[in-house]
Amino acid sequence: MAENREPRGAVEAELDPVEYTLRKRLPSRLPRRPNDIYVNMKTDFKAQLARCQKLLDGGARGQNACSEIYIHGLGLAINRAINIALQLQAGSFGSLQVAANTSTVELVDELEPETDTREPLTRIRNNSAIHIRVFRVTPK
């Protein structure tokens, strides 16, 4: 028999939007490192690309250059994360390589009742994620 992984008060069917308000929680993140870039769809593409390039180049003064960065994308931002990594690689004239890993992330949604007679509910859903390592290679 299939194991029920849903927490207490979990939702299995669609609920009436008049009865509940959907609140999507932020996904859990690992402790942030200086060379981690979390890509989203709200920030401008050129700004995210410039931030990645700045980390790889070491900023305006050339200090603290990272030999590798990790670009993380979740859901709709996967495409943008891939595009950023490919733009970095294309602009590096062969000095950068990329390695991608995919995963599935569990996200938790909270359903808050509109009336006091109902209990708050939670819903777990899965979303795809990508983690791209962009790193420098030594020329041969």
UniProtKB/Swiss-Prot annotation:
GO cellular component: cytoplasm; intracellular membrane-bounded organelle; multimeric ribonuclease P complex; nucleolar ribonuclease P complex; nucleolus; nucleoplasm; nucleus; ribonuclease MRP complex
Keywords from the named record: Cytoplasm, Nucleus, RNA-binding, rRNA processing, tRNA processing
Keyword tRNA processing: yes
InterPro entries linked to this entry: Alba-like_dom_sf, Pop7/Rpp20
Compartments reported by the entry: Nucleus, Nucleolus; Cytoplasm; Cytoplasmic granule
Main location (coarse class): nucleus
Superkingdom of this protein's organism: Eukaryota
One Gene Ontology molecular-function label: RNA binding
GO biological process: rRNA processing; tRNA 5'-leader removal; tRNA processing
The keyword tRNA processing is annotated on this UniProt entry: yes
Family the UniProt entry places it in: Belongs to the histone-like Alba family.
Function text: Component of ribonuclease P, a ribonucleoprotein complex that generates mature tRNA molecules by cleaving their 5'-ends. Also a component of the MRP ribonuclease complex, which cleaves pre-rRNA sequences.
Quaternary structure annotation from Swiss-Prot or TrEMBL: Component of nuclear RNase P and RNase MRP complexes. RNase P consists of a catalytic RNA moiety and 10 different protein chains; POP1, POP4, POP5, POP7, RPP14, RPP21, RPP25, RPP30, RPP38 and RPP40. Within the RNase P complex, POP1, POP7 and RPP25 form the 'finger' subcomplex, POP5, RPP14, RPP40 and homodimeric RPP30 form the 'palm' subcomplex, and RPP21, POP4 and RPP38 form the 'wrist' subcomplex. All subunits of the RNase P complex interact with the catalytic RNA. Several subunits of RNase P are also part of the RNase MRP complex.
Protein name (database record): Ribonuclease P protein subunit p20
Organism: Homo sapiens (Human)
Source lineage: Eukaryota, Metazoa, Chordata, Craniata, Vertebrata
